[in-house]
């Protein structure tokens, strides 16, 4: 099985077999064609199905799903945010509005902490989510990550760029 995490600007992937996570890889993916997705994700033999968590949108999802179909005979399976998973209850009235990346991080954080946790993730965006001891997702926030924040500050200020 191939596990794939597609963020806003980078993709991370690893094979998972009999409880063991294989070699992990990552790359920026801007503008990749279906052939580039196939070359990147299917370097190792033996992938029989693909599971994807993606915040990259429908066009990227379609490319990855088709790449999976061409390589395995089956389209990729995409994880969706739900009302409840792994003992964690989603705080959002409309679960799909919480990014799957944040949802998976909150459920994994709760499982790893065996209770209350606060999960931070920093990439293109920076996110923070909390989960109570009894598994209630408290919500959180998303803000620009460091690079986007600096570009915003440099573009919106006259003197900051010369001092950084």
List the model feature ranges, each with a label.
Residues 54, 92-97, 137-141:
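Flexible, glycine/proline-enriched loop segments at strand-loop-helix junctions
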Residues 111-114, 138-164:
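Glycine-rich phosphate-binding loop plus the immediately following alpha-helix
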Residues 84-117:
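Conserved phosphate-binding catalytic cores of ATP/NTP-utilizing and phosphoryl-transfer enzymes
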Residues 74-86, 124, 158-164:
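Acidic-glycine-rich active-site phosphate/pyrophosphate-binding loop
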Residues 1-85:
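N-terminal glycine/serine-rich phosphate-binding loop of ATP-dependent small-molecule kinases
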Residues 32, 59, 97-104, 144, ...:
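Conserved active-site and cofactor/substrate-binding residues in soluble primary-metabolism enzymes
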Residues 1-22, 109, 115-137, 153:
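Gly/Thr-rich phosphate-binding beta-strand-loop-beta motif of the actin/hexokinase/Hsp70
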Residues 6, 54-55, 81-82, 101, ...:
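Fold-independent oxyanion-binding glycine-rich loops
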């Amino acid at each position: 099985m191939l596990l794939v995490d597609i963020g806003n600007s980078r993709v991370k992937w690893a094979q998972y077999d009999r409880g063991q996570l294989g070699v992990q890889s990552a790359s920026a993916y801007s503008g990749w064609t279906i052939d580039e997705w196939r070359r990147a994700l299917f370097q190792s033999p033996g992938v029989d199905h693909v599971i994807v968590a993606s915040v990259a949108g429908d066009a990227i999802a379609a490319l990855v799903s088709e790449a999976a179909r061409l390589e395995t005979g089956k389209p990729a399976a995409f994880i969706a945010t739900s009302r409840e998973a792994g003992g964690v209850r989603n705080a959002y009235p409309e679960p799909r509005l919480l990014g799957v990346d944040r949802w998976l991080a909150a459920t994994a954080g709760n499982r790893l902490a065996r209770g209350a946790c606060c999960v931070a993730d920093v990439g293109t965006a920076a996110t923070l989510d909390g989960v109570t001891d009894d598994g209630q997702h408290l919500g959180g926030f998303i803000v620009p990550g460091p690079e986007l924040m600096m570009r915003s500050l440099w573009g919106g200020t006259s003197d900051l760029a010369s001092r950084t």
